[in-house]
Design a protein with these regions (language model features):
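C-terminal capping/extension segments of zinc metalloprotease domains
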Residues: 4-5, 11, 28-95, 105-112, ...
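Bacterial N-terminal signal peptides
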Residues: 17-26
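Short beta-strand-turn/beta-hairpin segments enriched in glycine/proline and small hydrophobics
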Residues: 100-121
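Short pre-active-site segment immediately N-terminal to the catalytic Zn-binding motif
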Residues: 129, 231-248, 318
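Conserved PDZ fold ligand-binding element
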Residues: 130-164
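Post-HEXXH active-site segment of zinc metalloproteases
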Residues: 151, 156, 262-290, 347
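Substrate-binding clefts and substrate-entry loops adjacent to catalytic sites
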Residues: 233-235, 260, 281, 285-323, ...
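Catalytic Zn2+-binding segment of zinc metalloproteases
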Residues: 236, 241-245, 254-271, 341
Length: 415
C-alpha cells in the first residue's frame, strides 16, 4: 500500500512539475521585434479624436434624417389629426443627451470630448424656424424669453414651458374660447454662436406633426415605429444614399403612426388571443410562450407589440400585419408627395430590399411581397398624379380622420 501511494505521488509530482515548467516558459515568451512604443498621452489624445468623430458622425446622421423629415412633418399636419405640436426645428441637449446618443460612452468620456451639463444646440432641421434664424449646431442659448439660461437645462426647460403656456392661451383666444383674441406670440432668443458672436432672433414656431424621428445605431437595413415615433436604422441610412429614397421610408413609417396601426394591432392581438386561447388557457399560453414563442416569431418574421402569447403574436402578425403594411405604403405615398418628395421612383425603393432578402419576392409572411408592393405603390403614385392634374387635394381615399377645416373647405371646392 505504501509503495503504491508513493508511486502515485511521484507521478503526480512529475505532472505538476511539467505544468509549472510549461507555464513558466509561456510567461517568459516575449516579442522578437523592436516595435515602436506609443506614449500613453498620445494614445489618449488619439482616442479623444476618434470618440469626437464618432459623436459627430451620429449627429450628422441625425441631421440628415431630421432634414429629410422636416417637410414631411410640416406639410402633413392636415393628416396628423390630433398628433400636432408647435416646433422650432431645433434639438438642444447636454452631456447626458450625448451619452444617450452615443451608447457605450461614459459620462467622463463625453465630458472629455467637450460636452458638459450646460445646454447646447445638437441639431437644427433645414428649413425650420431655427435654421432660418441662423441658429446652428454648437450654438449656446444665452437668453430665452426673459430668462437668462446661465448654462442650466432647468432654466431653459422652464422658459420653453412658459412660452408654450403663453402660446396655448393665445390660441384659445383666437379660437374664441376666451375673450380678447390676440396674435400668437413669438419667442425672443439670444444665442452665442460657435464663432463667439451673439445672435438675436424672434422665433415663431411652426405647427407640425408631432412624431419624433430618431436614429438607431443598429446596422440592419430597416426602420420601424413603436406607434408614436419613427426609428431609422444606421444600416438603412448607409445603404440608401439618395435622400428621396430615405424620405419614402420615413413617410412609410409616418403612415403607420398616423394610421394608428400599432394600437390597432395591439387591440387585434388581445382579441385574437382571447379567441385562440380563451381565458382558462391564458396561463398555459404564457408558459408556452416562454418556451416556444420566440422561435415561432422568428419563423413567422413577426415583430408585434409585447404582452401577448407567442402563438397569438404569430397569428396576429401573419393575418394582420400585411394589411397594415399595405396601408402604410399607401398613406406613405401621400405623405411623401405632400412633403415635396420626388415619388417617380417610389416603387423601386422597396425593391432594393429584395436584393438583401430574395425571399421578399415570394415568401414574406408579414409584409406584401416585393412585386405586389411595387405594383401597389405604382398604382398609388398614378392616383396621386391624377389628383394633382385635376387640382385636387392630396388626401388618401376614404381618409377616416378629420383634417383641418380649411382643407375640408378646399376639398369641397375641388369636388
Amino acid at each position: 500500500m505504501a509503495s503504491f501511494f508513493h508511486a502515485g505521488l511521484g507521478r503526480k509530482s512529475n505532472w505538476l512539475a511539467g505544468v509549472a515548467a510549461f507555464v513558466g516558459l509561456a510567461a517568459c515568451a516575449t516579442p522578437s521585434t523592436s516595435f515602436p512604443v506609443i506614449p500613453e498621452a498620445q494614445v489618449q489624445a488619439a482616442a479623444l479624436i476618434d470618440q469626437r468623430a464618432s459623436v459627430e458622425a451620429r449627429l450628422d446622421r441625425l441631421a440628415r434624417v431630421q432634414a429629410i423629415a422636416w417637410p414631411l412633418l410640416v406639410e402633413n399636419v392636415g393628416l396628423c389629426h390630433e398628433r400636432r405640436a408647435d416646433r422650432f426645428g431645433i434639438s438642444i441637449g447636454n452631456d447626458r443627451t450625448i451619452r444617450s446618443l452615443a451608447d457605450g460612452f461614459t459620462l467622463e468620456q463625453v465630458n472629455a470630448i467637450g460636452y458638459d451639463a450646460s445646454p447646447v444646440v445638437l441639431n437644427v432641421s433645414a428649413g425650420s424656424p431655427a435654421a432660418l434664424a441662423g441658429i446652428v449646431r454648437g450654438s449656446v442659448p444665452v437668453r430665452v424669453g426673459g430668462t437668462e439660461i446661465n448654462g442650466e437645462m432647468k432654466a431653459l426647460n422652464g422658459a420653453l414651458a412658459d412660452f408654450t403656456e403663453l402660446r396655448e392661451k393665445a390660441k384659445e383666444a383666437d379660437r374664441g374660447d376666451v375673450e380678447g383674441a390676440s396674435e400668437l406670440p413669438v419667442l425672443p432668443v439670444v444665442f452665442r454662436q460657435p464663432d463667439g458672436s451673439e445672435l438675436e432672433a424672434d422665433l415663431a414656431p411652426e405647427t407640425v406633426c408631432s412624431i419624433p424621428i430618431n436614429v438607431s445605431e443598429r446596422d440592419a437595413v430597416n426602420a420601424n415605429t413603436g406607434g408614436t415615433s419613427v426609428n431609422m436604422f444606421r444600416g438603412l441610412l448607409t445603404y440608401m444614399q439618395n435622400d428621396d429614397d430615405v424620405a419614402i421610408v420615413v413617410a412609410h413609417e409616418i403612415g403607420h403612426v398616423i394610421g394608428r396601426h400599432v394600437p390597432k394591432q395591439r387591440r387585434n392581438s388581445y382579441t385574437s388571443g382571447m379567441i385562440v386561447w380563451g381565458v382558462p388557457l391564458a396561463l398555459g399560453a404564457s408558459i408556452f410562450d416562454g418556451f416556444f414563442g420566440s422561435a415561432l416569431e422568428r419563423w413567422a418574421g413577426v415583430e408585434t407589440p409585447p404582452g401577448q402569447a407567442g402563438m397569438t403574436r404569430v397569428l396576429n402578425g401573419v393575418l394582420g400585419t400585411r394589411s397594415f403594411e399595405r396601408e402604410a405604403d399607401y398613406i406613405g405615398m401621400y405623405v411623401a408627395a405632400r412633403g415635396g418628395v420626388d415619388i417617380s421612383n417610389a416603387e423601386n425603393v422597396f425593391a432594393a430590399f429584395s436584393k438583401l432578402s430574395p425571399t421578399s419576392t415570394y415568401g414574406v409572411r408579414t409584409h406584401p411581397t416585393t412585386p405586389e408592393r411595387q405594383l401597389a405603390i405604382k398604382a398609388a403614385r398614378e392616383e396621386i398624379e391624377a389628383k394633382r392634374a385635376a387640382g385636387e387635394l392630396l388626401i388618401p381615399n376614404d381618409w377616416p380622420f378629420p383634417v383641418p377645416l380649411e382643407e375640408d373647405a378646399a376639398l369641397a371646392e375641388t369636388n
